[in-house]
């Protein structure tokens, strides 16, 4: 009669076998982390613009004085714009139907809005990625996931060159337990037959406005 070992015995036997197999082995040294050659400030800004446009997102670079007009222009005929509590008042212009997320808007209200306007935590030129850590100028995650059009304002001094620098920039947010959202262009996905569908996991359209 065959005796079937218990689950605990089977696990112990498996782990013992693995332990014996690796007992005499030595872990290989990790290869050095590839570090790209440092870019000048102008090169970082150009690289970021190039990546953003490559994703099919829109890109504008303006001065602080030009920012409100750039936001209004990006909105076009869209006027119902959701803004988090921490958006600076000077960013908003007369004529906008501002929907403040105070108290929190319902998902249906977010879906009916024309656009959402946020700031960001940091942006990465190497990958054209924008990271939100959902502080006051970015709002809760739903704001940047449900509306179909996201206008994101990025200060020049928030743009770093590498992913490593970007991760370091939000390390404190991670320690605080804050959620992070990483954006690289508008939302898009493809099925197994490579049929591209936009807007499945977030806004279809992304407008990046760099200010500085």
Curated annotation (Swiss-Prot):
InterPro entries: FTHF_cligase-like_sf, LUD_dom, NagB/RpiA_transferase-like. Pfam families: LUD_dom. May function in L-lactate utilization. Belongs to the LutC/YkgG family. Homodimer. This is Lactate utilization protein C. The lineage of its organism: Bacteria, Thermotogati, Deinococcota, Deinococci, Deinococcales.
């Amino acid at each position: 009669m065959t005796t079937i070992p218990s689950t605990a015995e089977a696990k112990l036997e498996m782990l013992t076998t693995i332990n014996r197999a690796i007992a005499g082995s030595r872990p290989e040294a990790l290869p050095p982390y590839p570090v790209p050659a440092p870019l000048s400030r102008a090169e970082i800004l150009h690289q970021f613009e190039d990546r953003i446009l490559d994703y099919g997102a829109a890109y504008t670079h303006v001065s602080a004085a030009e920012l409100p007009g750039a936001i209004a222009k990006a909105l076009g005929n869209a006027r119902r714009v959701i803004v988090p509590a921490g958006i600076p008042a000077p960013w908003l212009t007369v004529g906008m139907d501002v929907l403040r997320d105070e108290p929190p808007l319902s998902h249906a209200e977010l879906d009916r809005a024309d656009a959402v306007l946020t700031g960001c935590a940091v942006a990465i030129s190497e990958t054209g990625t924008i990271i939100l850590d959902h502080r006051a100028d970015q709002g809760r995650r739903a704001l940047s996931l449900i509306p179909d059009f996201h206008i994101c304002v990025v200060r020049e001094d928030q743009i770093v060159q590498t992913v490593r620098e970007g991760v370091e920039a939000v390390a404190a947010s991670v320690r605080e337990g804050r959620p992070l959202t990483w954006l690289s262009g508008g939302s898009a996905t493809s099925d197994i037959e490579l049929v591209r569908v936009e807007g499945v996991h977030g806004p279809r359209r992304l407008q990046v406005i760099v200010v500085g």
